[in-house]
Amino acid sequence: KNIAVIGINSNDSSQEKYAEDSIEKMKEYATNLGYNFPYVVDEDQSAAKNFTAQCTPDFFLFDSDSALVYRGQLDGSRPGNDIPTDGASLRSAVDALLNSEEPVSEQLPSMGCNIKWKVGEEPDYFLSLKN
């Protein structure tokens, strides 16, 4: 059974303070982690806005009909909680999809840094979270 994976970086790397999200750094990161899937730049941030992504990382899993079956965390690890990064939450969702089972019922939101939006182009859904 096969699934397609794509990594999308929607952060605005044009601002000097977000240089860690540059294409050069993305290539280095992907090489160091052994990514064997496309890792692309969402230059105009339209992918993030279309998916209503809020943070990095944010995980979305779609079935073969392009229906969203999972949106949530990679796993329960958080800085300082001593839970190992193992991908358990996303893995459970993928396993359910590949085994033609119902999507996992518990879908906890991702935790991470906010997407670095282009100045003045923050989507309404993001601005409403800040208020």
Describe each model-derived feature in a short phrase.
Residues 73-131:
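Non-globular targeting/processing and membrane-anchoring segments
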